[in-house]
A protein has these predicted regions:
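Bacterial N-terminal signal peptides
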Residues: 10-22
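Sec/Tat signal peptide C-region and signal peptidase I cleavage site
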Residues: 24-28
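N-terminal secretory signal peptides that target proteins for export/translocation
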Residues: 1-7
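Long, low-hydrophobicity ectodomains and other hydrophilic envelope-associated domains
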Residues: 30-198
Length: 198
């Protein structure tokens, strides 16, 4: 009994795709670092809390920072947002109640007790905001700071800025302008990734 030609072609394509997928880094990747936190509302959001997860594929480089600085100098907040949109994802932010979104910029800085992680990405604009052309659409960044204490995990803290934009203050310094108040991050759990990568 002979096998029809189209079945041979399908079988060969299947084998080739399987081999190609096995060699892709996405299928044979190292373990990512994951940081879970509980975000507590402050000010007008007092009493509310949500879960926040930051998955770190890799950290951004000083060259990435320079690209963002130049983009801000040329186009202010809109320039920064456009530059973030063009950058590849270095992580993923998940906030309870959302599907989550790719994170374009994550930097790590050593501290006396551990590490400081700063992240920023474009905020997803909701359908209601777009429909009503809300003022909140100009706050198109989500950012955060995580202060990880490796000596005493209970002292790890941070801040989440769910809707923000960068502006220059009266002294010409960059500052974060928020739509509402920052959220306080606590109960941070750091699930270390593959050593040396993230």
């Amino acid at each position: 009994m002979q096998i029809p030609n189209y079945l041979r072609v399908v079988a060969n394509v299947f084998v080739l795709l399987s081999l190609a997928m096995a060699g892709r880094p996405g299928f044979a990747r190292d373990k990512y670092e994951t940081i879970d936190a509980q975000a507590y509302g402050t000010g007008t959001q007092l009493g509310q809390n949500i879960g926040v997860t930051l998955n770190i594929y890799e950290f951004s480089t000083p060259a990435d920072k320079q690209v963002l600085v130049q983009a801000y100098q040329q186009g202010q907040n809109k320039g920064l947002v456009n530059a973030l949109r063009k950058m590849r994802a270095v992580g993923h932010v998940e906030i309870t109640g959302t599907l989550g979104y790719d994170c374009s910029y994550i930097r790590v800085f050593p501290t006396a007790t551990g590490r400081k992680i700063v992240f920023a990405t474009n905020r997803q604009i909701t359908m209601a905001e777009a429909w009503t052309d809300s003022n909140s659409m100009s706050f198109d960044l989500t950012a955060g700071i995580l202060e990880l204490n490796d000596q005493d995990k209970s002292k790890s803290t941070g801040s989440l800025y769910p809707a923000a934009q960068l502006v220059l203050d009266k002294e010409g310094e960059l500052q974060m302008d928020l739509l509402q108040n920052p959220w306080r991050l606590s109960s941070l759990l750091d699930w270390k990734g593959t050593a040396g990568l993230n």
